[in-house]
């Protein structure tokens, strides 16, 4: 049976842990509000840009007048999956959920591609797939620190360069899509080549006017579209991470409080037993002196 000192030390240790988890919860809550605002502001622009470019590209493809390399289909033998995770842990199942989701994607598409490589954004993704000896083409760390659109542009540019150089025939983007503070959805979307199939039927009935030209518009907007999809994924992942960490720290704080209550009860019972024992010894000694 643990001594009173051991129980008291344990209570002090758990209280210190509770202070840490409570502080982390408050910090994550503040970061979540900012990240959520950024996601909600970016989503409409990203969706509208995607729809507009998809219609424009589908119309161009239907008229067979423009063949942009980011739109042109090709035999898909090799693929790359860019997996967005975090640099830090203590976020519940945030990282493990997306990593397992990507593993299922790799298994399901093993027959579709001769080779699938990975690029990881965040230390946790790199550690997860490296431990399983999977092919990691490139890893990016520190992206989430001072998250900026320029970082998304750099990621998109490197992925586009590998695609245009023929190193890969398709690029996919995997990340946690933000739903709420307690809910995230794991998604894998095709980044390259840009898929216009969903807008094909609607686009053929639209009469577009191009200034200065269709080729110039596609050359300018398609790379921007790729960068915007990466930027949206980074923002969605950041909001999901803060929400997951806030929930995990809230749960940890509640568990710590329950443990403190249990240990305090154990301490009081042990102290009561100790006092009772002392009283019995005093009474026994007094009886012996009679």
From Swiss-Prot:
One of the GO biological process terms: proton motive force-driven plasma membrane ATP synthesis
GO cellular component: plasma membrane; proton-transporting ATP synthase complex
InterPro entries, sorted: ATP_synth_F1_ATPase_gsu, ATP_synth_F1_gsu, ATP_synth_F1_gsu_CS
UniProt key word Ion transport: yes
Keywords, ordered alphabetically: ATP synthesis, Cell inner membrane, Cell membrane, CF(1), Hydrogen ion transport, Ion transport, Membrane, Transport
Intracellular or extracellular location(s): Cell inner membrane
Keyword Cell inner membrane found: yes
Family: Belongs to the ATPase gamma chain family.
Assembly mode: F-type ATPases have 2 components, CF(1) - the catalytic core - and CF(0) - the membrane proton channel. CF(1) has five subunits: alpha(3), beta(3), gamma(1), delta(1), epsilon(1). CF(0) has three main subunits: a, b and c.
Name of the molecule in the record: ATP synthase gamma chain
Lineage: Bacteria, Pseudomonadati, Myxococcota, Myxococcia, Myxococcales
Gene: atpG
